[in-house]
Amino acid sequence: MSTANTAASASLAQHDSTHGTVTWRLMPLLLVCYLFAHLDRINIGFAKMQMSSDLHFSDTVYGFGAGLFFIAYALFGVPSNMALDRVGPRRWIATLMIVWGALSTGMLWVESASGFYVLRFLLGVAEAGFFPGILVYLNRWYPARRRGQITALFAIAVPMAGVIGGPLSGGILELFHDAAGLRGWQWMFLIEGAPVMLLGLVVLKRLPDSFEHVSWLDAGQKQHLREQLASEEQRKSITSFGGILRNRQVWLLVAVYFAVMLAVNTLAFWMPTLIHGAGIGSDGRVGLLSAIPYLAGCLFMIACGRSSDRQRERRWHLCVPLLMSALGIAVAGLAPGNPLMVLGGLIVAGMGASAALPMFWQLPPAFLSNTTQAAGIALISSFGSIASFLAPYLIGWMRDTTHSASLALYVLALFIALGGLLVLRTRAAIVNPQ
C-alpha cells in the first residue's frame, strides 16, 4: 500500500510539474492577448461619454452600434473556428489580432452613425474566432480536472480589462482631450488599439500550435498529456457536428450562455453610463469607480475556480454567480440616482458575471470530443452573441423611450436568473470532472 501511495504521489507531482510548465509558457501571452481583446470591446462604453455628444448619437444609435459587433460575432464564429483547425492556432490567432487591432484603431476616424455601424460589425468579424478559438486551444493542453483554474486564469483578463481599462480610458478622455486636434475618445482608440497589431506579431512568433511541437516538454511529459487527454476523449458522447445539433444538453448550454452574456455585456457597455447617471460627473472618476466591480470580480473569479476544481463540482459554481449577477443588476436599477446603491449593485453583478464566464466554459468540453469542440464551442458562443447584441441595444432603446434604464435592467436580471436556474438541469454526472 505504501509503495502504491508513493507511486501515485510521484505521478501526481509529475503531472503538476508538467502543467505548471505549460501554464508558465502559455498563459502570460494568452492573458495579455485576451486583456486587449476585452479592452477593445469595453472601451466603447467609455468613449460614449464624449463620442455620443460629439457625433450626436442617441442612446439607441450607440446601443445598436455596440451590439452590431456581436451580430458579426454570431455569424462568423463557427467558420472562424473551423479556419483555426485548418490554418493552425498560431497563424490564425495572430491574423485575427492584427486585423482587429487595425479596425479598433480605425474607430478614431468615425464621423457618422453609418461609419460607426460598419466598423463595429467588421470588428466583430475579426474577433469572432479569438475567444472560442483559445478555449479549444487550451482544451488540447489541459485535462478536465485542471480547466476550472486555468480557464479562470485566462478569463481573469475580462475583469482585469475593466480594472486597467476604466482608469486608463477615463484618464485618456480627460488628459488627451483636444491634444493635437484629436478628441479624447479618438486618442483612446489609438492608444488602446495600435498595440494589438504588435501583439499579433508576437503571437505569430511565440505561440506553439500544440504540445507535440515544443522543445520545452520532454518525451515523458508529452506522453502524460497524451494519455490524460486520450482517456477523457473516450468518455465524450458527441463526435460529429450532427450530434451537436441533435443533443439537448448542447441547446441547454446555449440558453445558459445566453444568460451569461447578458450579464457580462450589460456591465461592459453600460456600467460607465450608469455610474455617470448616479451623479458622478468627471470622466476620470467614472473610470476609477468602474474598476471596483471588476477588481471584486477578479478576486471572486479566482476563488470560484479554485473551489470548483477542489470540490470537482461545476453546476452550483455557475448557478450561484449568475443569480448574484441578476440580483446586482436589479439593485442597480432600483435607485439610478443613488451612487451607493448603483455602485453596490454593480459590484455584486461584477463578481457574479466575472465568475460565471469561466465557470460556464467548463461544461461544453464534458460533452464535445476533440473533433467537435471547434464547431461546438463556436456554435454556443455565436448564440451567446445574440444576447450580447440585445443587452446594450435594449438598454439604449429603453433609455431613449422612458428616459430610464431601470425597466431594461429588471428584464435582463430576470433572464439572467432563469439562466442560472437552468444550469441545474445539466447532468451532474457528466459535467462534474471525474
Question: Whereabouts are the PLM-identified features?
Answer:
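Extracytoplasmic gate region of multi-pass secondary transporters
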Residues: 44-45, 244-302, 357, 361, ...
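Helix-breaking motifs and short loop linkers at transmembrane-helix boundaries and internal kinks
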Residues: 56, 88, 109-115, 126, ...
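Conserved MFS/SLC helix-loop-helix module at the cytosolic interface between two early adjacent transmembrane helices
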Residues: 75-114
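Helix-to-loop junctions at the C-terminal end of transmembrane segments
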Residues: 76-88, 300-313, 399
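Cytoplasmic membrane-interface "Motif A"-like loop-to-helix N-cap segments
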Residues: 85-97, 309-322
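Cytoplasmic helix-loop-helix junction between adjacent transmembrane helices
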Residues: 119-156
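Glycine-rich segments within core transmembrane alpha-helices of 12-TM secondary carriers
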Residues: 149-173, 195-196, 381-391
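C-terminal transmembrane helical hairpin of 12-TM major facilitator-type secondary transporters
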Residues: 314-363
